[in-house]
Structures are given as C-alpha cells and as structure tokens.
Amino acid sequence: MFLAQEIIRKKRDGHALSDEEIRFFINGIRDNTISEGQIAALAMTIFFHDMSIPERVSLTMAMRDSGSVLDWKSLNLNGPIVDKHSTGGVGDVTSLMLGPMVAACGGYIPMISGRGLGHTGGTLDKLEAIPGFDIFPNDTRFREIIKDVGVAIIGQTSSLAPADKRFYATRDITATVDSIPLITASILAKKLAEGLDALVMDVKVGSGAFMPTFELSAALAEAIVGVSNGAGVRTTALLTDMNQVLASSAGNAVEVREAVQFLTGEYRNPRLFDVTMALCVEMLISGKLAKDDAEARAKLQAVLDNGKAAEIFGRMVAAQKGPNDFVENYAKYLPTAMLSKAVYADTEGFVSAMDTRALGMAVVSMGGGRRQASDTIDYSVGFTDMARLGDSVDGQRPLAVIHAKDENSWQEAAKAVKAAIQLDDKAPETTPTVYRRITD
C-alpha cells in the first residue's frame, strides 16, 4: 500500500518511481481515489524532473492496463495487427488510404482515432462527413469488421485507457500538456490497448506540427519508439514535413474526396503519396509482410493499381454503415459548400512559406472544426487546390479554392489564406517530405 503524497514527494525530490508506485497512482486516477490536485502535482513534478525509460514504460503500461486491452487470438487472423499514429497536422488524410492499402497487403488495422484538436483535423470528423458512417460499432461488430475487411477506423471507447482521459483533462488546465514522458504515455496507452504487433509513428515537423521545433519533434519520436519497443511492440517513427498543407485539400468532406481519388488513381498529390507510401512501407516491414523497402513498395503499388485498396476502403465504409457504393459515387454523398470560389494573391510570386497552423485554424473558423467539444461541424467547408511551396501564383493560379457557407465566411477565410502564405520573387529550396527514420 502506498500513499499518493509520498509518491509525489519522491518524484518531487528527483527520484525514480517504481513500477508498483506508478501502477498504484494510475489505478487511483481511474478509481477516483487520487484527487485532481494530486494528479496536477505529479504531472508538474514529471514536467520538471522527466522520467527514465523504465519509468516511461511503466507509466504507459499502467495507463494501458487501466482499461481493457484488445486480444485478437480468438479470431485466428492470418496476418499481423498493425497501426499508425500521427501527431496531427493539416490536410493529413493518410489514415484513410493507409489502412486499406496495408489491409490489401495482408495486415489487420484496428485503428482507434481521434477528433480534431486545435488546428489539426480529426480522422473521425472526416469519416463522419460520409452519411451514416458509424464510428462507434460495438466490440463484436468491430472484431467482425477487422476479420472480414481487414481495417476499421473507430473512436475511443470509455473502456480503453480510461485513466488517460482524466490525467489529460488535468494536464490540460495545469500547463503540463507539453511534457514528453506524459505525451508519450498518453499516445501509447491508447495505441497499445489495440493489441498491436507493430506500430509506426508519424511525427510532424514544421509550422503545422504539434511540437514547436524540429528538436522537440525528434525527441518525442525517439521517446515513443523507445517506450513502445520497451513495451514489446515493434515500433519505428518517421519525422515528416508539416511546413505546408500535406494534401491538396484541408477540411472534412474535401479530404475524404481526395482520399477516394487517391485510392482510385484519379488524383494523387505527390507529397501525400510520398508520406503515405513511406508509412505503409514501415508497417509492412515491421509487420513482416515485406522483407525490405523495395518489396513493400511493389506490393503497395500493386494494390493501388489493381483497385484492391479502393475496394477495401469501400467495404470498410459499407461495414461501418456508410453507403455501399460510396467509392463509385462519393460526389453524390459528400456534402458540398454553398459557396466555392478561388482566392488569388495580391501580387505575383513564388510561394516561399506557409503558416500551416493558421490555415488549419482558418478551417476551424469556417466551421470545419471545433473550438469546444459541444460545437457542431460543417463538414462541407474547407480548402481545395492548395498552392504548394515553390508554386508560382498569379491571376491565373490561385492560392486555394475556398469552400464556405456564405460570402462573409469566404471573405474571412480569404484574408486568413493571404496572411498565411508568403510570396517571394524566387522559388525556395525544396524540402524533403520525410526527414528522418527513427528505430530503437
């Protein structure tokens, strides 16, 4: 038996906590025997004193074990359970293609996703732009979809890592969100509850990233890889670029439209293709579905070319109560905005920099995201045909096409787009889409 205040005191004085002490505290968070003040105190001591790798592993596993952990053995699946997690960005629609692509190559992807947070779009919000799409199937149905289709994308239920929800709510109001050990545990507790064999992390870098600097993004990636491997799940991470909108669109329905076009081959944004393929390659290699990069890329290209990935996306949508013919008739089903027109730069030039965070917030301001949990989303609004870094813009080539609910909203968004995109008289140097691969 431990005392919460003694655990806090021990960490306050700079000592490492034992696995038993950490589990006692996390179970107390779950059971409401630890007060909010005590949670806040421990969070602040961790913020200032950090945690060793063994402590981080213990914290992550204790938070994972505070709820149910999915077990797939009874399904006798003939492939690995794999997933991807992104730290979030703007126009980051990779999950919608990646899940079906990896499933088409023999993986099983039980993806538990989130809603939009701040300037970043949420995979669940995007999928809810599809009429009828059910993000909360019951456990039996979820397992059926994984076995039959190979991929399902659902929301977090109250039974998964419940201690994390209360811990995060306290961190949010005590300025302790941006602590690497606490971020690591929060992300991995939910992901490891999926019962994974392998995980790939997509950690964003740049003006639209969660972490403000390259160094902090790299530190977070290294922490997650170290802890997840320490917890027994094969994990790698990619540092990917978020200095511009990743896809050609940003919003909900507009990104779903682009995802379908990507899968069918109608249109593939080159940067989105690079990042999606790189993440899928990691999943295939970590899941032992391919021996190397070349074999993985060949398999992935094949399932795009032969339509198998698009078919699996369509089957997932239908299995989660969306339309049976969504892939074939997406334009009929996705909501469209009342007003769609282009915004042009005031001068000619090359796009030299982009405040990606500001562009994400512009989508939120149009109604495409939430400022608070009770807000409703306008799934139709957003940007398409986004200019990319290095593009020459003028009276013919717009900065973006804005999809808005009315003229006032369009004008506000146009102002935000112009302010967020810098022009220069010469093109900037090209930056990579993937900066670094991190392994244990």
From Swiss-Prot:
The keyword Cell division does not apply. Pathway: Pyrimidine metabolism; dTMP biosynthesis via salvage pathway; dTMP from thymine: step 1/2. Transmembrane segments: none annotated. PROSITE patterns: THYMID_PHOSPHORYLASE. It catalyses: thymidine + phosphate = 2-deoxy-alpha-D-ribose 1-phosphate + thymine. Its EC number is 2.4.2.4. Keywords: Glycosyltransferase, Transferase. GO terms for cellular component: cytosol. GO terms for biological process: pyrimidine nucleobase metabolic process; thymidine metabolic process. One of its GO terms (molecular function) is 1,4-alpha-oligoglucan phosphorylase activity. It comes from the Bacteria. NCBIfam families: PRK05820.1, T_phosphoryl, Y_phosphoryl. The enzymes which catalyze the reversible phosphorolysis of pyrimidine nucleosides are involved in the degradation of these compounds and in their utilization as carbon and energy sources, or in the rescue of pyrimidine bases for nucleotide synthesis. HAMAP family: Thymid_phosp. Belongs to the thymidine/pyrimidine-nucleoside phosphorylase family. Homodimer. This is Thymidine phosphorylase. The gene is deoA.
